[in-house]
Swiss-Prot record:
UniProt catalytic activity: sulfate + ATP + H(+) = adenosine 5'-phosphosulfate + diphosphate
Name of the protein this chain belongs to: Sulfate adenylyltransferase
Chain residue ranges for the region called N-terminal: 1-170
Site label Transition state stabilizer, positions: 204, 207
SUPFAM superfamilies in UniProt: Nucleotidylyl transferase, P-loop containing nucleoside triphosphate hydrolases, PUA domain-like
PANTHER family (UniProt xref): SULFATE ADENYLYLTRANSFERASE (PTHR42700:SF1)
Activity modulation comment: Allosterically inhibited by 3'-phosphoadenosine 5'-phosphosulfate (PAPS).
Species: Gibberella zeae (strain ATCC MYA-4620 / CBS 123657 / FGSC 9075 / NRRL 31084 / PH-1)
GO (cellular component) term, any one: cytoplasm
GO molecular function: adenylylsulfate kinase activity; ATP binding; sulfate adenylyltransferase (ATP) activity
């Protein structure tokens, strides 16, 4: 039998409000609407389906203060993470938000009405206090703190919700269970005791050994419930991770484990988050919850130390275990013993015993370089999934971004580089020349700084998508401003390698060899906002390569670029 929900009753607002769905939908069409962010949507889904029971809406000021200060709602119920709907003054004014007002909450992805919020109060939070009390610090290297300070808006709106529509998902539908559905699934399987395992990372043999040990220690089954909402920036995408979990599942003893996805927006809140995770798993029917080393920890702070102690989360959950109503299963790091081919918790290993380990950094290096990942660390079927999503450098897309004055030679270099890369084969080559982009992507833009920056932003977006798809991209705009170039690098590097090449041909040479007469026209005032004449050019501070067509020929410059690409493992051969 599944565990009792937190607070005694599962607050499944979808089930509660289903008889009134048509009525609520009709009302929602007439109300002002607030479009929710991705994080809001994650929170909303788990409020509406009962995953955040006993919550029935976003926190009012009384509830918020209780949670921040004491891990408790205003009625005394244990709850450790503030669930807030943040808005700005413009939204308050535009939507007429005030106590008693009703507002539709809308999905930004498909413009569907999801719920109606009845506003109870609007309040301005003390964000510094929230950061220190909830996350233990106001250090913005913590992603939860950074979000709070940089993204969360000025005011919070509290109030109860009425459910209209479920959020639409189009991936892994067979693994998406509401708390009610998962409880029914456990009952169908006849599971009496369920140990839940939280993860935001791929699982390897150590995780399998840990969860099997936990289940056997409690004579229970295992629920692998990975987060597929928002996790730590830089984490492996959930599509890859879920394929890993599915590949791993057959390695469990027959009938021991089940896999279900959790659409949670993590805060990386360490001890507080562990308590919150336990409440969520209790609502999903689990009777036990694994809390391991540095649970939901965000990594290092500004001093280079971990934000939380390795077992702080276990201490906090243990303090509230009796009231919490879900049993914590403590586990330390699992270490491999090659002489006996087994994993043991680090505190059970005799001193002097030979051990082996592969760090996360080393694993990423082996994936990048194609080096062997031994079976004692991870199963072949798991490694296969990870290698599919981590192609070798020679199989990846990349962007070569050239910047320089008009007539500096960028276009000639770009065309020659395109021919050279096409000769080598292995990936498609796309070219984004300044004039072509202006004609095809940005015909309405002028040459003000704002328009120039927008043009570079568009080039960067196209380059990032092509790079993600495995193409070699050669971009050659003037790109005169450092901030826009940095933004382009930041965007493209999310998809693959980015190389900034400064074509530093002197302005005098560019003007002297100008056969089109554009410099002369600019000097005569016929062309305005012309880079190098009446508009500035900011030389790159940290280019990956500097070339000069006055001193070099196109062939030698292309060879330099090819050598740069080859040294980064992006070309099989010269």
């Amino acid at each position: 039998m599944a565990n009792t929900p937190h607070g005694g009753v599962l607050k499944d607002l979808f089930a509660r409000d289903l008889p009134r769905q048509s009525e609520l939908e009709a009302e929602a069409q007439k109300l002002p609407a607030l479009t929710l962010s991705e994080r809001h949507l994650c929170d909303l889904e788990l409020i509406l389906n009962g995953g955040f029971s006993p919550l029935e809406g976003f926190l009012t000021e009384k509830d918020y203060n209780g949670v921040v200060e004491n891990n408790r709602l205003a009625d005394g119920a244990l709850f450790s993470m503030p669930i807030n709907l943040d808005v700005n003054q413009a939204e308050i004014d535009q939507l007429g938000l005030k106590a008693g007002a009703r507002v539709t909450l809308r999905d930004f992805r498909d413009d569907r009405n999801l719920a109606i919020l009845t506003v109870e109060d609007i309040y301005r939070p003390d964000k510094v206090n929230e950061a220190k009390k909830v996350f233990g610090s106001d250090d913005d290297t913590h992603p939860g703190v950074k979000y709070l300070f940089d993204t969360a808006k000025e005011f919070y709106v509290g109030g109860k919700l009425e459910a209209i529509n479920r959020l639409e998902h189009y991936d892994f539908l067979d693994l998406r269970f509401t708390p009610s559905e998962l409880r029914a699934h456990f009952n169908k399987l006849g599971w009496q005791k369920v140990v839940a395992f939280q993860t935001r990372n791929p699982m390897h043999r150590a995780h399998r050994e840990l969860t099997v040990r936990a289940a056997r220690s409690q004579q229970a089954n295992v629920l692998i419930q990975p987060v597929v909402g928002l996790t730590k920036p830089g984490d492996i995408d959930h599509f890859t991770r879920v394929r890993v979990y599915k590949a791993l599942l057959p390695r469990y003893p027959n009938g021991m484990a089940a896999l279900a996805l959790l659409p949670l927006a993590m805060r990386m809140g360490g001890p507080r988050e562990a308590l919150w995770h336990a409440i969520i798993r209790k609502n999903h029917g689990a009777t036990h919850f694994i809390v391991g080393r540095d649970h939901a920890g965000p990594g290092k702070n500004k001093q280079g130390k971990d934000h939380y102690g390795p077992y702080d989360a276990q201490v906090l959950v243990q303090e509230h275990q009796e009231e919490l109503g879900i049993k914590m299963v403590e586990f330390q790091a699992m270490i491999y013993l090659p002489d006996s081919d087994e994993y043991l918790p680090i505190n059970e290993i005799p001193e002097g015993t030979r051990t082996l380990n592969i760090s996360g950094t080393e694993l990423r290096h082996r994936l990048r370089t194609g080096k062997d990942i031994p079976e004692w660390f991870s199963y072949p079927e798991v490694v296969k999934v990870l290698r599919e999503e981590n192609p070798l450098p020679a199989e990846k897309g990349f962007t070569v971004f050239m910047t320089g004055y008009q007539n500096s030679g960028k276009d000639q270099i770009a065309r020659a580089l395109q021919a050279t890369l096409n000769q080598g084969g292995g990936r498609p080559v796309s070219m984004l020349l300044g004039e072509n982009v202006r004609h095809e992507l940005s015909p309405e833009l002028g040459f003000t700084r704002k328009d120039r920056d927008l043009n570079i932003q568009r080039i960067a977006f196209v380059a990032s998508e092509l790079t993600k798809a495995g193409a070699a991209v050669i971009a050659a705009p003037i790109a005169p401003f450092e901030d826009a170039r940095k933004a382009a690098r930041d965007l493209v590097e999310k998809s693959g390698p980015f190389f900034l090449v400064h074509v530093a041909t002197p302005l005098e040479y560019c003007e002297k060899t100008d056969r089109k007469g554009v410099y002369a026209a600019a000097r005569n005032g016929e062309i305005k906002n012309f880079t190098g004449v009446d508009d500035p050019y900011e030389a790159p501070a940290k280019p990956d390569l500097v070339v000069d067509l006055e001193k070099q020929n196109v062939r030698s410059i292309v060879h330099q670029i090819v050598l740069l690409l080859e040294s980064n493992g992006l070309l099989d051969r010269l």
